[in-house]
Amino acid sequence: MNKKKKYVHTKQFNSHDCGLACISSILKFHNLNYGIDFLLDLIGDKEGYSLRDLIVIFKKMGIKTRPLELQENKTFEALKQIKLPCIALLEGEEYGHYITIYEIRNNYLLVSDPDKDKITKIKKEDFESKFTNFILEIDKESIPEKEKDQKKHSYFFKDILFRNKLIVFVILLTSLFVVGLAVAGSFYIKFLVDLIIPRSLRESLITITLIFISMVLIRCIFDFVRSYLIIKLSYKVDKEMSNVYFNKVTKLPINFFENREDGEVISRFNDGIYIKDFFSANFVTAIIDIILILGLGVILYRTNNILFLTIILPILLLSCLAILFFDHLKKKNQKLMEDKAKSTSLLINFLKNMTTVYSLNKTSFFLEKFHLTYDKQLNSTFSVAKAVISNEILKGLIQNSFTIIILWVGTRQVLNDSMSLGTLLFINTLAAFLLSSLDRILSMQSDLQQAHVASIRFFDVVNYPVQQDSNENLTELDFIQNIKTVNLNIGADPMRYIVEDINLILDRKDKVLIIGESGTGKSTFAKSLSKLYKVPDKSIYLNGLDINRYDHLSIRKRIVYIDENPFLFKGTIKENLCMGEIFDQNEIENACIMSQCHEFICNLDKQYSYKLSENGSNLSTGQKQRLALARAILHQPQVLILDESLSNIDPDNTKLIYETLHRMDCLIILITHNDPSNFKYNKKLVFRNNRIIESSYSENKEYSI
């Protein structure tokens, strides 16, 4: 008998992305862990999504769908014939409201409504009153298999635990010794009250005291070993998470970064600290505390069952309190992390552009925007703190009240000679241990919620689908003879392509000029040639072979794209030019001579060992652009694409660089807004309205046309 699949619920981010949430639920139901973030990149952020938009998203993933309009008054007869789960369109705002139907039962439907917090039931009559009669049926057979690199949260951490099982075992063992010795120490007061004092055993007092002091010393040694190993495990978890995260970041498509603020990517990584802390410390502590609660429970039951039952009551009350606050804290922590990401993004954006802020005298605007955003973060922090404090106060009320009640019940038994005073003090100590362990577990609630929300945000990046080069038949690109595009269309929305119907042939020694206004698709076309964007099959050919048949890393070695914002990091000029590759000094200097930056480098202190600041802020923009060009030339591309990358270089140096480009034995593509007078090209392409509206060609490569 097949195991029944668990129904998946995805909550919408905003009021208009219910359709994306429904798609995500269906994909996750079929073991494809794709969230709303990924789906947004497929279609773009809109104010609402039509049924056609949903069909387009499924189509982009290779999944077949069938839109249906059901007859009125025959809704449920028709629904019984449809493959579930499916997406239903209900009446709502402009684009309506989407829900996922999982089951149809006698009087109700089991659905995932993205506006709700979980899977819900909807009565048939309520459904019919809102139903628009439109259904989107999904062909299960066309749904692809689960991506190999997708990691479930639990599997990821189980794998870490398995690889560090010896450390985890020793941590658990030493923790048990620490707890056991701490509990054993409680017998000291029982011995004093019931044995030593009544019988005046002065000599035994010294012996027993030394034994218990030795136990304290041994406990401290075990505690040190335990703490050291927890730090070591934390280090390994941190290293594993950072490796997984940044290895994935380096494989993400370019539109992932274009559609997100810098602070969002950084904050998701920083959120990992909540996961690491909970996993490495709280997780182990929770296991020990659970063992301690069970062990002490047995001891208390065998010692005095009446007091045991008295202690059970606060445990039940505290557990109920934790359940009541669980969802409440989850929502507040999620809001807090989102607000932190927005504050970080805004701060990074302004700090990177303080020159503009100062030059326009807009510091007051910056402060106003920052305080407005940061105040939202502070309000979220305050809201979380209030919820945590309320929880702690109620826990304290229960614990302190029952501490008195336990002593009251125990004292009555001592007065009735049902129990000795030493036993009461011993039980009270054990009860304090038990309630303290329970308190630690329940206090993890906020940490657990933070770790849970952080793991969702963290694994949204880790599980983001990337361009896979798993095909064994992929070809290594060694040499580019020509590039051909056939009906090339690039864009998320088929109704509004960014680049549309591009047909051309470029040869190895061509010098190509592309001009056009901003937003006409020039950069998108250029990035597609180097496969920075996903390219449709049979639309770009390199040497007559589909670009998707080549390994994309080898493509980017041969085709180098440079934009107008040169990337320079904190380090020497030589380090920035080589970026991990090994070149001899002559090669480096020749590349710099070709890009007209050798002279100004020689005038710098330490020349090629001159230290650049972050983003090369101690150089002019024109100098940075020349360094970026030198780096590209140094890596010997066969196709060099310059997208406004010479825009800030002075005219004299620009003219010399154009002459160098003309002599280079490779395909040059220069993208500008205007026709440069000094650039010698043999092909010219004019972009307008996302198409090439004009192309001209000259056999004579020595002169501009």
From Swiss-Prot:
Protein name, entry field: SPbeta prophage-derived sublancin-168-processing and transport ATP-binding protein SunT
Highest rank taxon of the organism: Bacteria
ABC transmembrane type-1 domain boundaries: 168-450
Residue ranges annotated for the ABC transporter domain, each copy included: 483-705
EC number assigned by the record: 3.4.22.-, 7.-.-.-
Key words of the record: Antibiotic biosynthesis, ATP-binding, Bacteriocin transport, Cell membrane, Hydrolase, Membrane, Nucleotide-binding, Protease, Protein transport, Thiol protease, Translocase, Transmembrane, Transmembrane helix, Transport
GO molecular function: ABC-type transporter activity; ATP binding; ATP hydrolysis activity; ATPase-coupled lipid transmembrane transporter activity; cysteine-type peptidase activity
Subunit structure: Homodimer.
Sequence similarity: Belongs to the ABC transporter superfamily. SunT family.
Domain Peptidase C39: 12-138
Active site: C18
Organism: Bacillus subtilis (strain 168)
